[in-house]
């Protein structure tokens, strides 16, 4: 990204979208989860950019606001197939998160109010996740066989590993 977007300068930042590729158009991406045995990590060598109106998930991001808040499309978030407010009319539903008291990964990743975010480390004994419920349209692979699981904007190096739950053919 280059230059100022409203009051925010994202020069030197990259915005990366991660998707899980499936084998069938009807495969269902249920969750990205982690615990001490099967950790999920999304890390940067610096911090993650978070827009003031952004959140840990894109559930409340309305593209109507992009003209007034030009940095909002570059907010960092985790998802299951959504890029913004879910469209219930086509069967989409909000992405949910769960975290343990000992590892508040959601709060570490998105501290709120546009503050820089830390790494996602879901690696404690209890674990955590972001997920959609089976049957939510946003989790279905579709014709491109992909489901978006996150957008990460950083001026550092991005790395990690994801532990994903997929229902083959939706079962």
Write out the residue ranges for each language-model feature:
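Non-catalytic macromolecular-recognition regions in eukaryotic signaling proteins
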Residues: 1-171
């Amino acid at each position: 990204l280059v230059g100022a977007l409203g009051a925010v300068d994202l020069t030197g930042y990259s915005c990366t979208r991660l998707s899980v590729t499936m084998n069938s158009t009807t495969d269902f991406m249920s969750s990205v989860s982690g615990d001490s045995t099967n950790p999920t990590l999304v890390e940067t060598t610096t911090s993650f950019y978070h827009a003031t109106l952004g959140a840990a998930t894109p559930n409340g991001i309305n593209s109507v606001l992009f003209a007034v808040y030009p940095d909002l499309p570059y907010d960092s978030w985790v998802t299951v197939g959504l890029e913004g407010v879910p469209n219930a009319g086509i069967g989409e539903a909000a992405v949910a998160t769960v975290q343990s008291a000992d590892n508040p990964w959601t709060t570490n990743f998105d501290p709120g109010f546009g503050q820089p975010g830390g790494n996602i480390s879901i690696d404690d004994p209890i674990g955590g996740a972001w997920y959609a419920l089976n049957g939510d349209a946003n989790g279905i692979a579709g014709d491109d066989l992909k489901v978006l699981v996150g957008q990460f904007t950083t001026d550092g190096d991005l790395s990690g590993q994801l532990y994903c739950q997929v229902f083959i053919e939706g079962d």
